[in-house]
């Protein structure tokens, strides 16, 4: 597996991975999946990719992208789902379904955390459904709950990068 920096050319793949992350539960009814994918707020996570504060990594197998992890800064006026503050980038991460549960997500997460620390960020944040298996990966990486959203269905989590 190769891990490389995300570039402008990865915009389409990042968008795909964003929707994979948003529609993470294969047991959801079709209507809920469609609603999640149609949420205009998701566009905030990839529109104008490459602006200041954006960074990401892509996992490749045989030169094909199989996963991505990225972060973006948000503002108080236009926060993301996992917004903590304007100095803490919010991350997104997803792996192509065929390649899940092989350690790719954890490798991407660790690489992105190193990159964020090297860029001078003190922490990263995210939003995750409480029942999403990925939550355990985030906890292993040092993410801790900051608050609950949607009546406890989602957690906003934060990890210090120190």
What kind of feature is each model-predicted range?
Residues 139-148:
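Conserved acetyl-CoA-binding loop of GNAT-fold acetyltransferases
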């Amino acid at each position: 597996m190769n891990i490389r920096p995300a570039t402008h050319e990865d915009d389409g793949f990042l968008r795909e991975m964003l929707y994979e992350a948003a529609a993470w539960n294969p047991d959801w009814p079709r209507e809920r999946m469609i609603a999640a994918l149609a949420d205009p707020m998701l566009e905030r996570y990839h529109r104008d990719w490459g602006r200041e504060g954006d960074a990401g990594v892509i996992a490749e197998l045989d030169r094909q992208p199989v996963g991505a992890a990225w972060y973006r800064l948000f503002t108080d006026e236009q926060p993301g789902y996992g917004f903590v503050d304007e100095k803490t980038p919010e991350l997104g991460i997803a792996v192509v379904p065929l390649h899940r549960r092989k350690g790719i997500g954890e490798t991407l997460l660790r690489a992105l955390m190193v990159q964020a620390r090297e860029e001078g960020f003190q922490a990263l944040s995210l939003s995750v459904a409480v029942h999403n298996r990925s939550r355990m990966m985030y906890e292993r990486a040092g993410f801790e709950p900051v608050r609950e959203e949607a009546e406890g269905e989602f957690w906003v989590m934060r990890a210090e990068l120190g």
